[in-house]
Regions:
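Active-site-adjacent loops and short helices of periplasmic peptidoglycan-processing enzymes
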Residues: 2-3, 27-184, 188-197, 261
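Bacterial N-terminal signal peptides that target proteins for export
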Residues: 2-14
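Basic side chains
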Residues: 8-9, 71, 157, 244, ...
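A near-ubiquitous, low-amplitude feature marking generic local secondary-structure context
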Residues: 12, 35, 43, 106-110, ...
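Hydrophobic core
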Residues: 15-23
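Residues in and immediately flanking transmembrane alpha helices
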Residues: 21-22, 84, 214, 297
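Domain-terminus/edge residues, biased toward the C-terminal soluble/receptor-binding domains
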Residues: 163-167, 175-425
Length: 425
């Protein structure tokens, strides 16, 4: 009995340590890459956005130039600033040199002009839909008071999110030198952005019409630079909800995408990709994720999960079963494990279906849920059984003794009558 308890405790301790170790390694990829990327230096990070679980990782912790993916942090700080998105901003003269630098670098713009008054929501659409660098700089000035102070805010926010390989030097990513991050860090930033419904709506827009302003008499239609949200593109996927792309000569092609299907969400980051292969790889990796992971039964109510010792009962230990089935979402190769919360032993009598403890169910180290553990049989205490047997034996002996007494008395009475008859004769 002692050995059984010892081994169960040891197994529970090992499982707890293993789960803690798994939780401490968020960058550990659980699955091999299903495709060959166009470049060995390409960085890939695919994760389950619902749980944070890493699915695929290739060069995910290596610093890369991130080009316009920088604009995700710019958008996040605007959305977190509390400023009225329908409020207007006037482009300051302080943007004069900034706009010249953007023009000299052949950066994408929304055609903003010094002195132009534009709504913040229009700046946000220009930033995320057409990847306008001038919009990023105006947002930086509006939120931070200056571009330099805004960049400081960007780096501080990245550190708060747990980014360790990120350094921003501008609000748009057009100027590469020193503006670096990792695929894993960009996933952290993107996941925070994805929590904001406005970010999801804006970044998932294929085309947007900016209204006329004081310096633009006509409306301006801006189009997405990313074909993943273009219904007419060969790369279009209906499950993709929002996306941000980027490109510079040093950064190569970059993309962040979020995809939802069947109640499950994945986030994907690709850095330093080939121009011809980026969107094909995005589709292939997200298609693979939805095809390879599914909801499946993990625990039924008829399979023994563990046992518990009984006291005052010779029939021990007793098997324990899940009180209800448990299902989970994962890969076919994912291993199911348990952490039990049980007493060392329980006293008999035990009823059929009696709750004894609980089991926390894990799939590939990630918690799925907790279920009650119950018995599937009835056990009666040996003390009660022995007491009943003793009482029955005593009753039987009393009856037998009583019967013998009656017989003895009856036999004695017959002999007395016989002697009386003989005396009369």
């Amino acid at each position: 009995m002692f050995q059984n308890r010892f081994f169960r405790r040891a197994a529970a301790l090992v499982l707890t340590l293993a789960l803690a170790a798994a939780a401490a390694l968020p960058g550990l990829a659980a699955y091999p890459m299903p495709i060959q990327t166009a470049s060995e230096t390409e960085a890939v990070y695919l994760f389950n956005a619902d749980t944070g679980k890493t699915i695929l990782a290739q060069n995910a912790d290596q610093q890369q130039y991130v080009a316009s993916l920088t604009k995700m942090m710019t958008a996040l700080l605007l959305l977190e600033s509390g400023k009225d998105l329908n409020g207007e901003v006037t482009v300051p003269t302080a943007m004069t040199q900034e706009f010249k630098d953007i023009q000299n670098a052949n950066g994408m713009t929304a055609g903003l002009r010094i002195g132009e008054t534009v709504r913040r929501i229009d700046l946000l659409y220009a930033l995320l839909v057409s990847s306008a660098n001038d919009a990023a700089s105006v947002i930086a000035y509006d939120v931070g008071g200056s571009v330099l102070d805004f960049v400081r805010q960007m780096n501080a926010r990245a550190a708060e999110l747990g980014c360790t390989g990120t350094n921003f030097t501008c609000a748009h990513g057009l100027f590469d030198y020193g503006n670096v991050s990792t695929a894993e860090d960009m996933a952290r930033i993107a996941a925070e952005c994805y929590k904001n419904p406005t970010f999801v709506q804006v970044s998932g827009t294929a085309a947007y019409t900016m209204p006329a302003t004081n310096l633009h008499q006509n409306e301006r239609t801006i189009n997405s630079t990313n074909p993943l949200t273009d219904t007419g593109s060969e790369f279009y996927r209906s499950y993709i909800k929002c996306v941000k792309g980027g490109f510079t000569t040093l950064a190569g092609r970059c993309a962040v995408a979020f995809a939802e299907q069947g109640g499950h969400t994945y986030g994907l980051v690709i850095l330093h990709a080939d121009n011809a292969s980026l969107y094909t790889e995005c589709d292939q990796l997200l298609d693979w994720a939805f095809e390879s992971f599914s909801d499946r039964p993990l625990v039924d109510t008829q399979t023994e999960l563990t046992t518990v010792d009984l006291t005052k009962c010779r029939a021990q230990p007793t098997a324990l079963y899940a009180a209800a089935p448990v299902s989970g979402y994962g890969h076919a190769d994912d291993v199911v494990s348990y952490a039990f919360d049980l007493p060392e032993s329980i006293p008999a009598t035990v009823k059929n279906g009696q709750k004894v403890g609980t089991a926390t169910v894990y799939l590939d180290g990630y918690e799925v849920g907790t279920v009650d553990l119950v018995t599937h049989a009835e056990y009666i205490s040996d003390f009660r059984t022995d007491s009943k047997a003793t009482l029955l034996l005593l009753c039987t002996l009393v009856v037998i003794l009583g019967a013998l007494t009656v017989l003895t008395l009856a036999a004695g009475g017959g002999s007395l009558n016989l002697r009386r008859r003989k005396r009369r004769h």
